[in-house]
Amino acid sequence: MRVMAPRTLILLLSGALALTETWAGSHSMRYFFTAVAPPGRGEPRFIAVGYVDDTQFVRFDSDAANTRGEPRAPWVEQEGPEYWDRETQKYKRQAQTDRVSLRKLRGYYNQSEDGSHTFQRMYGCDVGPDGRLQRGYDQLAYDGKDYIALNEDLRSWTAADTAAQITQRKWEAARWAERQRAYLEGLCVEWLRRYLENGKETLQRADPPKTHVTHHPISDHEATLRCWALGFYPAEITLTWQRDGEEQTQDIELVETRPAGDGTFQKWAAMVVPSGEEQRYTCHVQHKGLLEPLTLRWEPSSQPTIPIVGIVAGLAVLAVVFTGTVVAAVMCRRKSSGGKGGSCSQAACSNSAQGSDESLIACKA
C-alpha cells in the first residue's frame, strides 16, 4: 500500500529527526475513513480526514467539486504536487475498496438494498517523547458498531461477530496484518515525525484554558454550578468538582471536548448543589498549558458574561465535523487478543503504490 521510491529518503529524514529532536509528551497521527451507501444502488459517498494530535491536516470528499486531497493545515501545504497526487490516489483507491466492502457486508448480514449503511475505518500510530512508536491501531466499524480491529500486538485480529469472522479468515489467509504492522512501525512513525517538525509551532504549542465558574439558579433550593474551560490546546484536559476537598463523581454533567473553530477547544463540567452551599464546591482544572492545576470557586460578585458567541461557534464547528466526516463518534473500541499475523498478498488486498504517509489500502471485507 505504499510507494517505496521515496522510502530511503524518508528513513534518512526520520533518523535525523530522531537524533536531533524530542517532543514533549506523546503525539498521534490518525486517519478516519467513512463510506456511506445510500438506499438502493447509488454510489457511496467517501470522506477521509487526517489528524496530527488534535489538528486536522488533510481532507478528501468524493462528493466535492474538486475530488482531491485538500490541505487543512499550513505546515502540510508545503508538500509538493507529487505528495498530493499520491494522497488523492490513495483516497480514490480506498473509496473503490469500500464500495466493494459495503456490498459484501450487506450480503454477510443478509440486508436488503433498502437501507443506508456506513463503513468506517480509523488507523494510525502514537509516538512517545523520543519519537518512537508507542502504539498502532487499525479499527473498522459497520453501521456504527465494532466490526474488526487489529490487536495491540499488530499481528492478529479481533472480529466482533460471525460476519466479521469471514473477513478475519480472509485477512489471515492474505497475511494482511504483517503488512499493516510494517506501515504502522515504519512510514506512519516517519511521517508523523516529519509533520511534528514541520508544524512544531502549531502542533507542539500549549494554550492554557481561560476558566471561570457560572451560577444558574434552578429553584429556591438548588442551583447549577458550571465550570468553563475555553480556548485551550491540545484538547486533552481534566475538569473535576470537589465538595469540601472530596472529589465528586456522582451527578456530574461533563460535555465532550468541543472544537471552538479557531484551532482551540472548549469544555465544561456542571453539577447541581444546594442553594447557600456553593462555596463548599471547587472546580479543578488540569491541562498541559498550565504550570499547575487551577482551583476555582463561584464568585457571587463577579459572575462573568458567558461568551455565547464563541460557544455557539464551537457547536457549529462540532456539527460540521460530525456531519461532514461522520467519523469519530461511532468508531470501534479497541480489543486485544493473541494470534498470528502475516503479510498481505496482492491477490487478496489492494496493493497501492506506496509513498508519503499513505497506509495500505484496507483489504476488501
Swiss-Prot record:
GO molecular function, a single term: peptide antigen binding
Region listing for Alpha-2, in residue ranges: 115-206
Residues bearing PTM Phosphoserine: 356, 359
An annotated GO BP: positive regulation of T cell mediated cytotoxicity
Subcellular location: Membrane
Topological domains, Extracellular: 25-308
The Ig-like C1-type domain, residue ranges: 209-297
Disulfide bridge partners, by residue number: 125-188, 227-283
Domain of life: Eukaryota
Segments of this protein annotated with the region Connecting peptide: 299-308
Region feature (Alpha-1): 25-114
Glycosylated residue positions: 110
UniProtKB keywords: Disulfide bond, Glycoprotein, Immunity, Membrane, MHC I, Phosphoprotein, Signal, Transmembrane, Transmembrane helix
A GO-annotated cellular component: phagocytic vesicle membrane
Topology Cytoplasmic: residue spans: 333-365
Region Alpha-3, residue ranges: 207-298
Membrane-topology descriptor: Single-pass type I membrane protein
Stored Pfam families: C1-set (PF07654), MHC_I (PF00129), MHC_I_C (PF06623)
Membrane-spanning intervals of the chain: 309-332
Keyword Phosphoprotein: yes
Residues making up the signal peptide according to the UniProt record: 1-24
Purpose of the protein: Involved in the presentation of foreign antigens to the immune system.
Subunit structure: Heterodimer of an alpha chain and a beta chain (beta-2-microglobulin).
Family of this protein: Belongs to the MHC class I family.
Protein's UniProt name: Class I histocompatibility antigen, Gogo-C*0101/C*0102 alpha chain
Organism of provenance: Gorilla gorilla gorilla (Western lowland gorilla)
